[in-house]
Amino acid sequence: MKVRVRIPAVKEVSESMKTLSTTSELAAFCAEAQKHPYVTIDTEFLRERTYYSKLCLLQLAMPGKDDDTAVLVDPLSEGLSLAPLYDLFRDTSVVKVFHAARQDLEIFFVDAGVFPDPLFDTQVAAMVCGFGEQVGYETLVRKIAKKTLDKSSRFTDWSRRPLTDEQKIYALADVTHLRVIYEHLAGILETSGRTRWVQEELQILTNPATYITEPDEAWMRVKTRNTSPKFLAIVRELAKFREQYAQSRNIPKTRVYKDDAIVELSSTKPRDLNDLNRSRLLMREARKGDIAQGILTAVQLGLDCPQALLPQPDLGREKLQVNPALSDLLRVLLKSKTSDSGVASKLIASSADLDAIAAGLRDVPAMKGWRREVFGEDALRLCEGQIGLAAEGTNIRIIKL
């Protein structure tokens, strides 16, 4: 989390604040945590100079009112193993609580191939409980824990040692307030019967495919207006080489070359170093050595791609015949449903999903699971002319036709 607590200069650091630096200390904490219904977790990491995130600090807290049950874990300590933590992740009697868990979970999955079970993400839960879309930790701390966090605090290089007492207090705040937030949201979900909704949403966070980028599929993330299969074949090979190169050397893929360079190279089709040096968008480091050779090889592979193996763009939704009037009605219905349920509208259906439904598609997220209950069923009835919408003051009323 990037938001930190403002600490008055006169405040003394709690003597109970612990930093664990050995495997045995972590094991002892995790053994104690297994006696409790939940544990809150957060991480501090760096990713500016690497492909994979570098874990720099781990924060853990058991239920409690103060910092006595919260600890910091220093993963940079020599010889420290996170195996006890991963054993705790596998203990299904203890809920593992995060806020905006995706990047945290990616770190653990890459390191050990394990996911916390069961998982609770307060950001997802907050969207279901009426706190808006992608609500930030600072907002939940203010609204639920009734505390104030400092949004203007600067980012910290968490890889540097030793950590200051102020940094430690900052980090602990990410898990101590999270306890209050979790208990509050879990109570709302239980009362409203929406716990299952959150569980459905969290399935994508515990799906390995969420965190694995296959080099062969990297081209699908490159935005280009040219949909020619021959052009896309070169895009595919260039994106594949970049992903493989970045992964093998653990460097950001943008330091190899950027997406706009892929688009340019796929258009200019360089055959040799002289051609490569004419590129306007290619970084200097990419014009020589292994990267340059990889680019030339990738371009040639794309040019030589057999007709049967050429990539085909997914133009399914682009060719849809969208009924604009029906699409507008679906937006009105969605706004009405989100107003009634308190669920963030984007969590139920995106604009693209609404257009797809208006064009006759039914295999969209809004037509599955809890979304179908909240919105999908009435959306279908609206499309089929079974219901209409009527204004009633500031509200929208559904009427049967």
Can you name each region flagged by the protein language model?
Residues D165, L185-L401:
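Accessory DNA-binding and partner-docking regions appended to nucleic-acid-acting proteins
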Residues V5-V39, T43:
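N-terminal accessory regions of nucleic-acid-interacting proteins
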Residues T19, Q59-R179, A186, L205-T206:
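Active-site-proximal helix-loop-helix substrate-binding element of RNase H-like nuclease domains
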Residues R47, C56-Q59:
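Residues that scaffold, gate, or flank divalent-cation-dependent active/transport sites
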Residues L46, V124-V128, D260-E264:
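Conserved short loop/turn motifs at secondary-structure junctions
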Residues T50-K54, L72-D74:
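Short, glycine/acidic-enriched capping/hinge loops at junctions between secondary-structure elements
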Residues K35-H36, I41-Y52, G79-A83, D91:
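An N-terminal domain-cap segment
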